[in-house]
Amino acid sequence: MKKFVVLLMIALFVFSAQSSFACTIVGVGADATVDRSTIVTHNDDSTSADFRLWIIPGQEWPEGSTRDLVIDSHNYGDFGKYPEVKDYGNGMLVSEIPQASETYAYFHSRYSFINEKGVAMGESTFNFDQSTDLRKKTYKLIFGNNTGLIDCWNAQDIALERASTAREAIQIMGDLVEKYGWKDPGETMDVADGKEVWIAEFYGLDLWAAVRIPSNAFFVAANRARIDHIDFNDHENYMYSPNIKSFAIENGLWSEDSGVPFSPAEIYAPYEGLYSTRREWRALSLVAPSLNLDPDAKRFPLWVIPEKKLSVQDVLEICGDYYQGTPYDLSLAPEAGPYGDALNPYHKERSINLFRTCYVMIANIKDRLPDPVKCLVWYGYGAADTTYITPLWPTMKELPEFYRTGSRFEEFRRDSGWWTNSYVQQTARSNYQSAVKEIHNFRNPRLATLYTVTEEIQNTAASLIKDGKEKEAIDLVSSFAYTTAVKWHDDWLKFGDELYGTYMWGYKDMKSQPPSAWWNDIMQKAPRNPVPFK
């Protein structure tokens, strides 16, 4: 009975925690970027996420040390003094596992995303369509009696603690899943290390697969499984659990004689909803427009070859896209109102840019640099279209206080990074199409300079390391990242105040603004009282 209660509590933890999550990730190979870096991203979209950011320090551990295994371990715990003080918040300690002799420093927020070796990752949780009897059977087989102990949070934490390459990170997570079982809803992860970009998927139980994308390729995932093929003879580019095919055969989910190609995504996590497919279409079309992909297609290529080299700024704009210039442009939907509010929570289309994004993370990893300075991530709070991003490294000595200040469930705070960005974002909504131009005019020139300066800082730090001055190199990137982040925060807060004054009531400088012509047309045709008066 006690075991049943514990398992029930785990199930409630996992599925209630994940219910509001819906993230988008992209991955870009080194030959597809302007600076020959690998790039992986994560738009962490959630209504409840703990936005605080910590650096978990690297350590050496005595022989026989163990590590706590916690379900939902990133749910309002305090990691400010971890591991001396273990506060897992709403997480549940379920077991212990042997600890590695050495662990690496990494960034820990709602998810963990890059370590000091330059291994980075994001995640996107699967949807699962149960509209047919076979799909209902599959779901029940995987999740109906699932006693696994591994979820996305502890899997990524452990991988980042221990892995020095993307391939190693995936193998670590795969080994954990095979030994302890995957409890979460399914996940797609983009994992990179400067040389390679991998896509890993965890389907539940001990089932998983991964594929390396070509170095000149671009990938996107938007809340559904994407790996639709495994070459079982290509061990250089594919990894998978031993039973990835046999489980489907033994349980009547797929047959060698069916004539249907083996597709883990179609078998273990089927979903064809526009909620996911439209974002896939949009991201792929932005980088390879000449493919003329069908916006209503059910399946898209796992990757495409971008028609130009991509920069961090290009990727940021993809992360902030809301179908501009297409028939699905959110700023031209009725829900956008008279001033084109692309962040209205009630839009019928789901775009990559989203009002409830907790943070956007863009890992920008150059393999030619030494580990302490190549582990660069560009980080910003809130919707990508209306936020700034700033360079951070997990080798930094400390983060500014505003990264660990405040909560979504507490009062607005001007000393909180997330609240400051949310202030600008929410202010922009009063007259979005005008305000967002001001945001971009304020942000983008600064970012253009910052991209150049950051690369110079990395090169200088790399030279210091080459000369045996690693401490000085880390001091350099730490000071640069810290002061840059503080400057952004202070300037953004002041900018938000100016924006608020400019766009009070949706006016501009206290002058009313004419609504869009298309909006006027809609209003002319709308009934005076759409809800009958009683």
Give each language-model segment a name.
Residues K2-M9:
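Sec-dependent signal peptide recognition
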Residues F15-A22:
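Sec/Tat signal peptide C-region and signal peptidase I cleavage site
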Residues C23-C152, I172-P306:
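A contiguous strand-loop segment
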Residues Y339-E470:
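Substrate-recognition/cap regions that form aromatic- and gly/pro-loop-enriched pockets
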Residues N444-K534:
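Histidine-centered catalytic/metal-binding microenvironments
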